[in-house]
């Protein structure tokens, strides 16, 4: 079977929401929502191999460390594993005083009763009950009319209120979800929720949570935002209700739908770290939080060591995080393109500490989430001098002069073309070392002695030429001019740069020289030494040897 030529014969577009006076498009997110992780429930139930108790405990502690204050930990009536995990959290005193656990139950008497048994002794808990409300579920799955759906919800709400009253030592919160909210008629969603409100009688001091799931994402994010704004206008006791969002990513816009839903007036978000969950996953709490962070709003969640969080999530879920996943993927802060690398390098060069972040192609400073800069620029056959220069600067403190950047990039390009692979900073440095720092043939500097008097420099050098020792002597207005005068070939210094590598007692000097031998194109050399004069001499010998070697190769 192939794709239909006319998909309208099989699929219908989602109907638009009649909300001509919608206000959310002109709003921005200025307040942090209440965050609730569903990793241990919605995320866990979507895994090929659900987490065992040890993994769930490890995950729970990670969520606490990140700063989650509401954590949906289990579906305790669904399995003994989930039930026992809730008991271990409570009896083992693993729940901090500022954290509230949440558990899910279907709207059935036996399951609700079992759920309350799991929570006995908890200091605080959210009981989350749900039933499906969408027309297709009413008709196909449950064979219920609208009143039947309302009765299921209100009967469950009454039982929850009764059982909570029997355990007064626990600080209870109630949550109701009209499952498949995003595909339910808005008027009916409000009708069901208002019926639950009438049972639970919330107040501004003791609010209930109405969770509005896009259980299956079936429209563009603006439609979900319209639904949230419409619902907020029409639900009873809005000041006593926390509107919660629970989006999925079936169309790839779960994050966008949630952000627009917050602009439309929602107060709370349920989701999973890195977007785990049924089918295409729940909304990614990390992306949401760091999107806020990069807009100057701290999400009150701490991802300062995002790779440590990822490690726990990957090992517990037994699912890898995609290398292109926002903020956390291995490649999200990486540039291979030469033009991108050049822009990033220039951005880092001008970026001042504590200033507004303006580095091109990087929406967040990787250091803020515990990343180093090594992976920001990586070199392959598409890379240019900017990326190569950046890696040498960041990893080895070597700042190549501009013309030398061009020269060395051709060396690297030749190697990447030959290998067809990415090159690491270490491999690039090895190339630099072999091309420049180990260029000690045919002339090898053994030792030198410098005398300076009345503005004149005299240098005596011991040099090995093709294995034979030679003595050179030169005089000039400075050490380099004296060295050039001592050379057995005619050479001209075209450019010279130097800088320190490191600081303090362990600092070394790096010198870069561009020379031109008579009848040849200019070439560069590098020298590194604790002494700046020695470094400059080594740089000149490096350039000299490269020039002589290339001339001989050309002649051959």
Curated annotation (Swiss-Prot):
| Domain (Pyruvate carboxyltransferase) ranges | 33-307
UniProt keyword Lipid metabolism present: no
Q: Which UniProt keywords apply?
A: Amino-acid biosynthesis, Branched-chain amino acid biosynthesis, Cytoplasm, Leucine biosynthesis, Magnesium, Metal-binding, Transferase
Family matches, as PROSITE patterns:
AIPM_HOMOCIT_SYNTH_1, AIPM_HOMOCIT_SYNTH_2, PYR_CT
Q: Give me the ranges of the annotated region Regulatory domain.
A: 439-556
Question: What GO molecular-function term can you cite, just one?
Answer: acetyl-CoA C-acetyltransferase activity
What is this enzyme's EC? 2.3.3.13
Cofactor or coenzyme needed: Mg(2+)
What Pfam families does the annotation carry? HMGL-like (PF00682), IPMS_D2 (PF22615), LeuA_dimer (PF08502)
Broad EC category: transferase
Q: Where in the cell is it found?
A: Cytoplasm
Q: Which GO terms describe its cellular component?
A: cytoplasm
Reaction catalyzed: 3-methyl-2-oxobutanoate + acetyl-CoA + H2O = (2S)-2-isopropylmalate + CoA + H(+)
Pathway where this protein functions: Amino-acid biosynthesis; L-leucine biosynthesis; L-leucine from 3-methyl-2-oxobutanoate: step 1/4
Answer yes or no on keyword Lipoprotein: no
Give the binding site residues for Mg(2+). Answer: 42, 246, 248, 282
| GO terms (BP aspect) | L-leucine biosynthetic process
Q: Which PANTHER family match?
A: 2-ISOPROPYLMALATE SYNTHASE, PTHR46911
What the record says about family reads: Belongs to the alpha-IPM synthase/homocitrate synthase family. LeuA type 2 subfamily.
Its subunit composition reads: Homodimer.
What function does the entry list?
Answer: Catalyzes the condensation of the acetyl group of acetyl-CoA with 3-methyl-2-oxobutanoate (2-ketoisovalerate) to form 3-carboxy-3-hydroxy-4-methylpentanoate (2-isopropylmalate).
Q: What is this protein's name?
A: 2-isopropylmalate synthase
According to its UniProt entry, this protein's organism is Pseudomonas paraeruginosa (strain DSM 24068 / PA7)
């Amino acid at each position: 079977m192939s794709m239909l030529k006319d998909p309208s014969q099989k699929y219908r577009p989602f109907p638009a929401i009649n909300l001509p006076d919608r206000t959310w498009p002109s709003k921005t997110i200025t307040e942090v929502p209440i965050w609730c992780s569903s990793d241990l429930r919605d995320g866990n139930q979507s895994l090929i191999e659900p987490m065992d108790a040890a993994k769930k405990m490890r995950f729970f502690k990670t969520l606490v460390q990140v700063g989650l204050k509401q954590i949906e930990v289990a579906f305790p009536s669904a399995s003994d594993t989930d039930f026992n995990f809730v008991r271990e959290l409570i009896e083992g005193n693993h729940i901090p005083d500022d954290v509230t656990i949440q558990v899910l139950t279907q709207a059935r008497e036996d399951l609700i009763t079992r759920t309350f048994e799991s929570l006995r002794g908890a200091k605080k808990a959210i009981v989350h009950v749900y039933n499906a409300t969408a027309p297709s579920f009413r008709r196909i799955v449950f064979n219920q009319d609208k009143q039947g759906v309302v009765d299921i919800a209100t009967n469950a709400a009454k039982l929850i209120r009764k059982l909570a009253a029997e355990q007064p030592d626990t600080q209870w919160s109630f949550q109701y979800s009209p499952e498949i909210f995003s595909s339910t008629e808005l008027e009916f969603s409000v009708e069901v929720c208002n019926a639950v409100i009438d049972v639970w009688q919330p107040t501004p001091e003791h609010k209930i949570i109405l969770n509005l799931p896009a259980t299956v994402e079936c429209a563009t994010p603006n439609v979900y935002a319209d639904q949230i704004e419409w619902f907020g206008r029409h639900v009873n006791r809005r000041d006593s209700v926390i509107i919660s969002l629970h989006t999925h990513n079936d169309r790839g816009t779960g994050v966008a739908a949630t952000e627009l839903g917050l602009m439309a007036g929602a107060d709370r978000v349920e989701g999973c770290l890195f977007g785990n969950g049924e089918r295409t996953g729940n909304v990614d709490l990390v992306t949401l939080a760091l999107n806020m962070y990069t807009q100057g709003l701290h999400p009150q969640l701490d991802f300062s060591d995002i790779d440590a969080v990822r490690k726990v999530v990957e090992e517990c879920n037994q699912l890898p995080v995609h290398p292109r996943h926002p903020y956390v993927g291995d490649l999200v802060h990486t540039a291979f393109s030469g033009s991108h690398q050049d822009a990033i390098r220039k951005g880092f060069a001008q970026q001042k500490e504590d200033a507004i972040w303006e580095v091109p192609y990087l929406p967040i400073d990787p250091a803020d989430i515990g990343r180093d800069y090594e992976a920001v620029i990586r070199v392959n056959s598409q890379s240019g001098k900017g990326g190569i220069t950046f890696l040498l600067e960041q990893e080895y403190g070597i700042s190549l002069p501009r013309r030398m950047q061009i020269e060395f990039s051709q060396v690297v390009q030749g190697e990447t073309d030959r290998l067809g692979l990415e090159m690491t900073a270490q491999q690039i440095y090895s190339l630099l070392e072999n091309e420049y720092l180990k260029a000690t043939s045919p002339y090898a500097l053994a030792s030198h002695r410098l005398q300076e008097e009345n503005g004149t420099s005299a240098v005596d050098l011991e040099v090995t030429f093709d294995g034979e020792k030679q003595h050179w002597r030169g005089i000039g207005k400075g050490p380099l001019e004296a060295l050039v005068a001592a050379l057995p070939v005619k050479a001209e210094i075209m450019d010279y740069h130097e800088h320190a590598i490191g600081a303090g007692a362990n600092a070394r000097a790096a010198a870069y020289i561009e020379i031109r031998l008579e009848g040849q194109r200019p070439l560069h050399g590098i020298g590194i030494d604790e002494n700046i004069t020695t470094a400059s001499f080594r740089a000149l010998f490096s350039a000299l040897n490269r020039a002589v070697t290339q001339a001989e190769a050309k002649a051959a």
